[in-house]
Amino acid sequence: MAWSAAQYTKFEDERTRPARDLLAQVTELPDGPAFDLGCGPGNSTELILNRFRDNPLTGIDSDEDMLSAARTRLPELRFEKADLASWVPPAESALFFANAVFQWLPEHIVLFERLILALAPGGTLAVQMPDNLDEPTHVLMEETAEESAFASAFAGRAARRKSLPSPANYVERLTAKDVRIDVWHTVYYHQLANANAIVEWVKGTGLRPYLDALPAARRAGYLAAYADKIRKAYPTMKDGRVLLRFPRLFIVATRNR
């Protein structure tokens, strides 16, 4: 799946706020390297750099366009291309930080267990994942894909990612790994200019697998049909703007010393 750093950063302030909220719950780190997993264009990496300057920091991402943007933004740092599903975390690491990436990997709890085992005592795994598959933005992606004009392009392939496990599932699995764990949900209400802005937002993330599945000639038609549904689902407020409701799941697991 191809990503666009330019599309993603159209809403950089809104996308970075959850990373700030996640990092605020990481109180201190032991000695050792820190990693921004799924670093994207480097917006979250910059937050970590400014907070924990004594820990060598590396950004990891699977997309070359995102890595190019991150290297331009933070030329003093190291950025590596890797698939997180198979990436081997270095032992005695101080921080694994992951803002909005592991929702794309269905077996991510197994990966969390692997990351925790690579933490130094006192090290932290900090994760934020969108938990918005039941929101109109994502329900309508699937409804549009099922329309007769587009259904053939999606036959035999799943564009929709899997739902997240329950919070209890994370707690039960991860506490067995000798960590202190904190799990919570936050619902953000983003004030966007209009319904078209919502479409532009999800074009940078959730819509990517749907658009990638379609032939280029049919993407504009899909976007038009989807945008029409979004305008009906998100009513305009008195000032002309719309509210985008966005639930996110946070997990902070710190290895016991």
Swiss-Prot record:
Keywords: Cytoplasm, Methyltransferase, S-adenosyl-L-methionine, Transferase. Coiled coil: none annotated. It is found in: Cytoplasm. GO terms for biological process: methylation. One of its GO terms (cellular component) is cytoplasm. Its EC number is 2.1.1.144. Its main location: cytoplasm. InterPro entries: Methyltransf_25, SAM-dependent_MTases_sf, Trans-aconitate_MeTrfase, Trans_acon_MeTrfase_C. It holds the Pfam family Methyltransf_25. It catalyses: trans-aconitate + S-adenosyl-L-methionine = (E)-3-(methoxycarbonyl)pent-2-enedioate + S-adenosyl-L-homocysteine. Gene3D superfamilies: S-adenosyl-L-methionine-dependent methyltransferases, Vaccinia Virus protein VP39. GO terms for molecular function: trans-aconitate 2-methyltransferase activity. Catalyzes the S-adenosylmethionine monomethyl esterification of trans-aconitate. Belongs to the methyltransferase superfamily. Tam family. This is Trans-aconitate 2-methyltransferase. The gene is tam.
